[in-house]
UniProtKB/Swiss-Prot annotation:
Modification Phosphotyrosine, positions: 77
UniProt subcellular location: Cytoplasm
UniProt domain SAM: residue ranges: 6-70
PROSITE patterns xrefs: ARFGAP (PS50115), PH_DOMAIN (PS50003), RA (PS50200), RHOGAP (PS50238), SAM_DOMAIN (PS50105)
Biased composition (Basic and acidic residues): 1653-1670, 1688-1703
Function: Phosphatidylinositol 3,4,5-trisphosphate-dependent GTPase-activating protein that modulates actin cytoskeleton remodeling by regulating ARF and RHO family members. Is activated by phosphatidylinositol 3,4,5-trisphosphate (PtdIns(3,4,5)P3) binding. Can be activated by phosphatidylinositol 3,4-bisphosphate (PtdIns(3,4,5)P2) binding, albeit with lower efficiency.
Top-level taxonomy: Eukaryota, Metazoa, Chordata, Craniata, Vertebrata
Ranges annotated as C4-type zinc finger: 698-721
Species name: Mus musculus
Domain Rho-GAP: 1114-1295
Ranges of residues in domain Arf-GAP: 674-809
CDD domains found in the cross-reference section: ArfGap_ARAP2 (cd08856), PH1_ARAP (cd13253), PH2_ARAP (cd13254), PH3_ARAP (cd13256), RA_ARAP2 (cd17227), RhoGAP_ARAP (cd04385), SAM_Arap1_2_3 (cd09490)
Protein name: Arf-GAP with Rho-GAP domain, ANK repeat and PH domain-containing protein 2
Length: 1703
């Protein structure tokens, strides 16, 4: 675009070109419609019209300066003065040989102001005013000034003529013309025309003498014509000058030629506003051709002109209106006036495009001129002042009403413009509009004026307009009077007392602080809010506002008067009104909670500052607390419990705010961030880089006006893509802002972006990008991130021309390319895999960078410098066809993740660790996971070698932090370290875990990584194939399945359903001198032993397997299952009822205790494997109630609600076989677990109805009970009952049961009902010796201990045997005594006695341990201990094994018992404990071993798994108090059975017939009786074998339960003598309980000698001889079972072994 179009551009286009179109209304409101109107704009004017951000004002001023300075001509000022009534002035002509002309300036004073010394390049203004009277010239020399020909209103300068009487020339206008590039206008040197314009004055006839230093810069049309036709131009002569305009042709630098092959007649907006730096302009400035002749001006020329300023006339030389020269605006308005010869051919064009009757524009322009020129403070001095004296005066801003109607500089604005404006608008792109308002203005600027120009009187009839002289010098802001000091301020509330405050007045407001070091005030009073200031007595003064009166007090009266005078003078300042006018609406306001303040604070965001006010009324009155400037602030979201919190952080203080909602908080954060960005933004770099048209759209998504860039990839990108570019890592992508990172943008880097551009860069990066793969502007974040990673990191779309080159060839090509100017070739080589630091072969210039430096290629150097850390791999063109292993090698990920590392001891508090950490920038590349403090850091905080990972845990459930949900995964290393990472979405979590798993799981087990695993890693294992050797295998947890790939020849993936586990136990083995935990898993016929690398990863696996093997939900398939896929709860209930309920009347029609049913059902749901149903402990009715409740409460009915209409409709079929066939089809359609459960349940009900003669439960009665359970309906219907009855009656046909299975069922029923009265001993009973009160022979009792006996039962039995009745208030307990009677501890009443006894085997001297029953506590002591929730004291402590530093001595420690833990402190004043013992995990014994050499004999010993601690007390009372307190706290006050609780019995008379009873420990004399019992069992076996008609197949096929029952009966060893002896050792209460025990509905268990006699009679009827000895293997197996002390119901040996033993 030509420079004339630039100068005359519409203000809208100008603001759009610098992305500040939000200020369009501000400019138009004050009369700025074109760029030419802005010639006199400075920082103060911009501030007044409402542009508060400093960066925006600076950008506007720089752009205006650039436009005016781009003119190739020298600047010219035309100072045109217009008469009030439109009369003409006489022009004084000065002839010279060149016939050139210059204008005179009409002014009332002949005073010249000149600042000597500046260099020509500084363009210092030399102002010359000549006083004179304008004469009317001839008609052909006249050029009337028509008001409608002028663009701008008139501005008047009132000047004092002399001391006696002033002669005023109204309407003197001063206008600065923009500089216009000469090459934009074509003219002929020989055709030069000027016009004479005459100005007349009604008060004076003196003509303004010609200033020989001025040249014409504007046209003044005559009143007779608008176009200037018929007017002869006269050129004024001027002497040669070194500043004379050079008129040669300029050569355009190719750097600024657009890359587009087609160029329009004008430059685009990007070229218009691009402002290169000074060094860039110097290097690439246009080179003019040598002219034919030049003229110089002697140095004495200006001195001659200075002497001519006393001329009595004012002359004005008019130039052609079509000429494109104008004056340049420079900082502070300091310019010289120059002239150049212009052509007048196109003068008449100006009026064709300019509207002359635009009244609105004229009024607005009048406002503009009043802002630019008015001055309200003048000194009417009487004395004569020297001509060269200059006075600083304020420039007020409030007068907008005194307007002139015309401007003498009309020709400066009347150039061809409108046609160019329409073209430019088409190329303009609108930027996002932002509103930035100012609350307060900066201190006002000062200008210097000649005193004579300000001392004149203004005529009443003249329009008052105080114009700024073009000769004014800008010296910056005036030094406003400031004052600060310590004052006493009267508090507004409370006692109204004076408080010391540091008070500061900065010329705009009064603020008070707590001290002189604080940066933010406690209160602020702007001048605009002050009504008056008045003095009071006692050295006080008041500041009165509309809201309240502030009272201050000083020490001295002089100081008070000084404060008052300063404040009053500031109040009288004319600048105060301009502050009021500038107050505009805020961008955001509202009440927020501010930390440190009780009440909510009214917070206001206005422009570049945040105001804090007590309330909205204070804000409206102008009062505030403090102001937070945004240019030094930052805003961030706070991770606190209150989610609506955010902080504004400044270098001096952080302000923490809390909003009412999350939405409001986000709005505040966005508003503050936008204010900060706009305050700090500078478009200078962006405009330069946008000079290349391809850089005006994002390189990735084509978004317009991108303001970010990757400085090493050389692409310009938008804000959305910039966020994803950061994910590539700081080494591979350095993202910088074009607006805010100004320090990084050197001239060379800017030039590099202009030369390359997005188009050429994408020719390489996206050379193979298909149309359907392109990224759209509105693409989601995940797609954008994947695209950018594929494009730059993986090189998926780049050109592959260099793919065939090796690394060495690429390096050689790079060395050859860097010495040439083509940077694109270097970029292609480097990003194709060439090494930026490769060896060049030159010992001096050893790197490509040094080679480029040697060759002087600055752009190559710049590119290589920013890529010095880049490491782009050499991509294979056939990469996609490679193996998955290769794909894993190229995996790359990066993102912000929550990250923290934890030791093994702290992993339990992993979520708390994540709460205390911040996000880290995590990068996974090359098999290493590195985490950085942020995405700009180049040094990682830590690095994890993925190949060393042994376990990866993925938490599917989300965990909520203060910032929202996070999804955690853990990485375990062999060094007992665990790293926790948290992602914000499950997709990010899955992406990271999949990539990490593929890095450390080998190829042979890659199928494991494809599952939806919760845990994956490596474990050691043993199985049935090799039990003697531990091997490594890869395991993965997929919901309830354990997938594993073992080191076998097949190496196939296997799967184990953890819900079907028959056994899940943990044991310990010693390996390499250390204890290692081993997990045993048994599923059907498979056994697997596993252990981890460390205790930490084993704990993770064990916990996960236990959780997966447990119950997970209320659905049928989520229950723990047996090996036949029947839920354990169903199987256990069926087995219990089958064993004990076949002979019970109305078994399923009786209701149990609802409380017991609920407890038992909850136990099954918690862990069904651990629940063992035992007669005596569980009632039959409760078990049946559990079964019915479970079937009724599962999520879906066992027969499924979906099939309900089909089941009922089957009853319509009359044919029983056809109906049975339908039932069979329905059952096949059921889910597998439902089908197996239904089969087991119907089999059980079929068995029950088979015994209906005994239990009275036929098929119909059973169907009445179970129809509502199986269909889950309310109540019963006949159809449902009939369906269930059909299923029971037709069980054999529906489930296709074989005949031998039915026969076996009948045999089992007969055995169960036949042997129901037989008394069988409890399995695993032991006879042990228990002492009463002390260990003496007379105090011992030998008693039978069952595996389920608890300490309560043992204590009561011993007391009953000894006939001891405890005293009221005494508590007796069983004590365990060990270590040769040195240590003892009371057993809790619920502790299992046998378990404690079996643990004695691990003691050094097991034989010294025994049990004793004695008095423990009293009720009174318990009450005292319960009252003290916290117990503390000083005890002596010693640890075993002792630490090296602590020595082998007891040391005083402060011990505190609190919250179920025992805390050890070094001293009572310590705030951090040394040790902490959880009470439930410890055993506490009374006493201390003597070998520990305790200082006292009263102490406690604490046992843990690895360590022992010894505590010594001062007295026996203290010892007992500590023990009682610990015992009560350890069991949470539950230390004796509740009143009325029924005592449990462990000795049962009817144990399970199918169980395997054991021979109790007896004296040797009982062996003979045992052999007799075995012989009797053999005879019974033979009799049963004969009853099966000697069919060996039938006997072999009999069930395991049948033979187990048989052996159980054979091992009956209770003869009459032994029974009498056992009865002798039990109390009478026990005998009564024995008679009363047994399931409801069964006969009494004990029948006496008659039962034995009947049994002997049956045995005598055996037809076969019995072997007198039982096979030895049976005895061995029974011994093993006895040693293990297993519970009653255990599985028997396998079927073949049992058959062998029976035979």
């Amino acid at each position: 675009m030509s420079s004339v179009s630039e100068v005359n551009a519409d203000i809208r286009d100008f603001l759009m070109s610098i992305n500040l179109e939000q200020y369009l209304l501000h400019f138009r409101e004050f009369g700025f419609y074109t760029v030419r109107d802005c010639t006199s704009i400075n920082d103060s004017v911009l501030h007044q019209i409402g542009i508060s951000p400093t960066g925006h004002r600076r950008r506007i001023l720089k752009q205006l300066q650039m436009i005016f300075s781009k003119m190739q001509d020298f600047p010219i000022y035309a100072n045109v003065h217009k008469a009030k009534n439109g009369s003409t002035t006489k022009e004084q002509q000065h002839s010279d040989p060149s016939s050139s002309t210059h204008t005179g300036i009409e002014c009332s004073d002949s005073i010249t102001v000149h600042r000597p010394g500046p260099a020509p390049s500084e363009m210092v203004t030399t102002s010359t005013l000549s006083e004179g009277n304008c004469q009317s010239p001839k008609s052909h020399d006249k050029l009337c000034l028509s008001s409608h020909d002028l663009l701008c209103p008139e501005e008047e300068l009132h000047q004092n003529v002399d001391s006696s009487k002033d002669s005023l020339f109204g309407g003197v206008n001063v206008k600065i013309d923009p500089l216009i590039t000469k090459r934009a206008v074509e003219y002929t040197a020989g055709e030069e025309h000027t016009e004479k314009g005459n100005l007349t004055s009604e008060d004076s006839s003196k003509a303004l003498s010609t200033n020989t230093e001025c040249l014409p810069s504007g046209d003044c049309p005559t009143s007779g014509t608008h176009s200037g036709n018929g007017t002869n131009g006269v050129l004024e002569s001027f002497p040669p000058t070194p500043f004379f305009q050079f008129q040669g042709e300029m050569v355009v630098n190719e750097l600024y030629v657009p890359s587009s092959p087609v160029h329009g007649p004008m430059r685009s907006r990007s070229k218009l506003v691009s402002r290169p730096s000074r060094s860039f302009l110097l290097r690439h400035r246009p080179v003019p051709e040598i002219p034919g002749s030049t003229k110089s001006i002697p140095g004495s020329y200006f001195r001659d002109r200075r002497s001519n300023t006393t001329s009595a006339g004012k002359s004005l030389t008019l130039k052609n209106s079509n000429e494109d020269n104008s004056t340049s605006i420079f900082p502070y308005g300091e310019t010289f006036l120059f002239q150049r010869l212009e052509s007048s051919k196109k003068r008449s064009i100006k009026n064709e495009f300019w509207p002359h009757e635009n009244t609105v524009k004229e009024e607005a322009a009048t406002t503009r001129n009043s802002i630019l020129t008015q001055s309200s403070i003048y000194d009417n001095r009487k004395e004569k002042v020297s001509e060269d004296k200059v006075e600083d005066i304020w420039i007020p801003r409030e007068d907008k009403n005194n307007l002139a109607q015309d401007s003498a500089s009309e020709s400066e604005y009347s150039t061809v413009e409108e046609c160019f404006q329409s073209l430019r608008r088409k190329n303009s792109k609108a930027s996002k509009s932002r509103t930035q308002k100012a609350f307060y203005l900066d201190p006002f600027n000062r200008h210097s004026y000649p005193l004579s120009s300000t001392s004149g009187n203004t005529e009443p009839s003249s329009t008052i307009s105080n114009a700024i002289s073009p000769y004014a010098c800008f010296y910056g802001s005036s030094a406003a009077k400031e004052k600060c000091g310590w004052l006493d301020k009267l508090s507004p509330q409370g006692k109204r007392m004076f408080q010391k405050r540091w008070v500061k007045f900065d010329g705009l407001s009064i603020s008070h602080y707590n001290n002189d070091r604080e940066m933010y005030s406690k209160g602020i009073i702007p001048l605009t809010a002050i009504s008056t200031v008045r003095a009071q007595g006692d050295n006080k003064f008041e500041i009165v506002t509309t809201q309240r009166t502030f009272v201050f007090r000083v020490e001295k009266e002089e100081e008070r008067n000084d404060w008052i005078s300063i404040l009053l003078s500031a109040l009288k300042s004319p600048s105060l009104a301009s502050q009021l006018q500038a107050a505009v609406a805020p961008e955001k306001c509202g009440y927020l909670e501010l930390r440190g303040y009780k009440a909510k604070i009214f917070t206001v965001l206005r422009g570049n500052s945040v105001w804090l006010c007590k309330n909205e009324q204070d804000f409206k009155s102008g009062l505030g607390i403090t102001i937070i400037p945004m240019n030094v602030a930052n805003v961030k979201q706070v991770d606190r419990a209150v989610k609506q919190s955010f902080e504004i952080i400044t270098p001096y203080r952080s302000f923490s705010f809390t909003a009412d909602s999350e939405r409001e908080k986000q709005e505040w954060i966005e508003a503050v961030q936008q204010s900060i960005a706009e305050t700090l933004s500078d478009y200078e770099v962006a405009e330069k880089i946008w000079f290349n048209e391809s850089n005006r759209s994002c390189a990735d998504c084509k978004a317009p006006d991108p303001d970010w860039a990757s400085i090493n990839l050389c692409v310009v990108i938008c804000k959305k893509c910039a966020g994803q570019h950061r994910s590539l890592g700081p080494k591979d992508c350095k993202v910088r802002s074009l607006k805010m990172d100004a320090s990084i943008w050197s001239n060379e880097l800017i030039e590099l972006f202009i030369v390359i551009g997005n188009k050429r860069a994408n020719d390489f990066w996206a050379g193979n990008l298909q149309k359907d793969e392109e990224l759209q502007v509105d693409s989601p974040v995940e797609k954008r991130k994947n695209f950018i990673t594929q494009k730059y990191k993986e090189g998926k779309f780049r050109k592959t021309l260099l793919a065939s080159l090796t690394k060495e060839e690429l390096n050689k090509a790079l060395c050859a390319a860097v010495v040439k100017p083509d940077v694109l070739e270097t970029m292609a080589l480097l990003f194709s895999g060439a090494d930026v630091m490769c060896a060049t072969g030159d010992p001096v210039h050893s790197t490509p960078y040094l080679l480029a430096k040697k060759a002087g290629q600055s752009l190559q150097m710049e590119f290589l410098y920013h890529n010095k850390f880049s490491d782009f791999p050499q991509y294979d063109a056939h990469f996609e066809g490679g193996s998955s292993q290769d794909a894993a090698q190229s995996s790359f990920l990066c993102d912000f993740l929550y990250q923290t590392a934890a030791a093994a001891s702290r992993v339990s508090s992993e979520k708390k660790l994540l709460e205390d950490t911040n996000k880290k920038w995590c990068v996974l590349e090359g098999g290493f996971l590195s985490y950085y403090e942020n995405d700009r850091c180049t040094t990682p905080n830590g690095t994890i070698n993925i190949s060393e990972v042994i376990c990866l845990a993925v938490h599917k459930e989300d965990f909520y932090l203060n910032t929202g949900p996070i999804f955690v995964f853990e990485i375990y290393l062999p060094s007992e370290r665990v790293f926790l990472f948290g992602a914000e979405t499950s997709q990010i979590q899955r992406k990271w875990t999949e990539t990490i798993a593929k890095r450390f799981v080998p190829f042979v087990a890659e199928n494991l990584t494809e599952a939806d695993y919760d845990l994956i890693g490596q474990l050691f294992y043993k199985d049935c194939h090799a039990l003697d050797q531990w091997r490594k295998g890869w395991f993965a947890m997929d919901k309830s399945s354990l997938c594993f790939c073992l080191q076998t020849q097949e190496a196939q993936e296997e799967r184990m359903n953890l819900r079907r586990l028959q056994e899940l136990t943990i044991s310990t083995m010693v390996q390499n001198g250390e204890k290692v935990d081993v997990l045993l898993l048994v599923e059907k016929g498979r056994t697997l032993y596993i252990h981890g690398h460390t205790k930490l990863d084993f704990t993770v696996w064990h916990t996960a397997i236990e959780k997966a093997a447990g119950t997970d939900g209320n659905a049928l398939q989520d229950q723990q299952l047996c090996k036949n896929d029947v839920p354990i709860i169903v199987n256990s209930c069926i087995a219990f009822v089958t064993q004990y309920g076949l002979g019970c009347k109305y078994i399923y029609q009786k209701d149990g205790d609802p409380l017991h049913i609920s407890e038992l059902l909850e136990s099954f749901k918690k862990d069904a494997r651990s629940v063992k149903l035992r007669a005596g402990k569980h009632q039959l009715e409760d078990v049946t109630g559990v079964l019915k409740s479970f079937l009724s409460d599962i999520d879906d009915a066992l027969l499924t609600k979906e099939l309900y209409p089909y089941w009922v409709s089957a009853l319509d079929t009359q044919d029983e076989k056809e109906r049975t066939s339908k039932y069979r089809a329905f059952i096949r359609s059921l889910p597998g677990v439902n089908r197996a459960t239904l089969a087991a349940l119907i089999e059980h009900l079929y068995r029950v109805q088979k015994c209906s003669e005994i239990n009275h439960m036929n098929a119909h009665n059973l169907a009445m009970v179970f129809s509502s359970c199986l269909f889950q309906t309310k109540g019963q219907t006949s159809e449902e009952v009939n369906v269930i009855e059909d299923l029971i009656n037709n069980y054999v046909e529906i489930f296709e049961v074989k005949e031998d299975q039915v026969k076996q069922m009948d045999i089992e029923n007969s055995f169960i009902t036949k042997w129901k009265d037989t008394q069988v001993s409890q399995a695993g009973d032991l006879l042990i010796e228990v002492f009463v009160e002390r260990k003496e022979p007379d105090c011992s009792i030998i008693i039978r201990i069952s595996p389920v006996m608890e300490a309560e039962e043992l204590t009561n039995d011993i007391l009953a045997i000894k006939n001891i009745i405890p005293m009221k208030g005494d508590i007796w307990a069983t004590f365990e005594v060990i270590e040769n009677e040195e240590l003892e501890r009371p057993l809790h009443y619920t502790e299992n006695v046998l378990e404690q006894v079996l643990q004695w085997s691990s003691l050094a001297e097991p034989g010294s341990a025994y049990l004793v029953v004695k008095r423990f506590l009293t009720v009174d002591s318990i009450k005292q201990c319960r009252e003290k929730s916290i117990k503390e004291g000083i005890l002596k402590l010693k640890e075993e094994p002792s630490k090296i530093l602590s020595g082998n001595k007891f040391q005083d420690r402060c011990v505190v018992l609190r919250d179920g833990h025992l805390f050890i402190y070094k001293d009572p004043k310590s705030s951090k404990h040394d040790k902490m013992f959880p009470l439930r995990a410890m055993k506490f014994y009374l006493g201390v071993k003597k070998k520990m050499k305790p200082p006292t004999s009263w102490g406690l010993t604490v046992y843990s798994e690895k360590h022992h601690w010894h505590l010594c007390c001062d007295s026996l009372q203290a010892q007992m108090e500590w023990m009682a307190s610990i015992f009560i706290a350890q069991h949470e006050n539950d230390i004796w059975p509740p009143a009325g609780k029924e005592r449990k019995r462990s000795i049962t008379k009817n144990p399970k017939i199918g169980g395997l009873p054991l021979i109790p420990i007896q004296h040797e004399r009982n062996a003979t009786q045992a052999r007799k019992n075995i012989e009797t069992a053999r005879a019974e076996l033979e009799r049963l074998r004969l009853s099966e008609k000697h069919d060996p197949r039938d006997f072999t096929d009999s069930s395991l339960k049948d033979r187990a029952s048989l052996i159980a009966h054979c091992l009956e060893h209770k003869d009459e003598k032994l029974r009498n002896r056992a009865r002798k050792h039990r109390s009478f209460n026990c005998l009564e309980d024995t008679e009363a025990e047994g399931p409801h509905g069964l006969p009494k268990a004990y029948k006496g000698p008659k039962t034995l006699k009947k049994t002997e009679e049956r045995n005598s009827k055996a037809t076969l001889d019995a072997d007198p000895k039982l096979p030895s293997k049976v005895i061995e197996e029974l011994s093993v079972v006895l040693q293990r002390s297993r519970p009653l119901h255990k599985e028997l040996p396998d079927e073949q072994t049992l058959q062998k033993e029976v035979k």
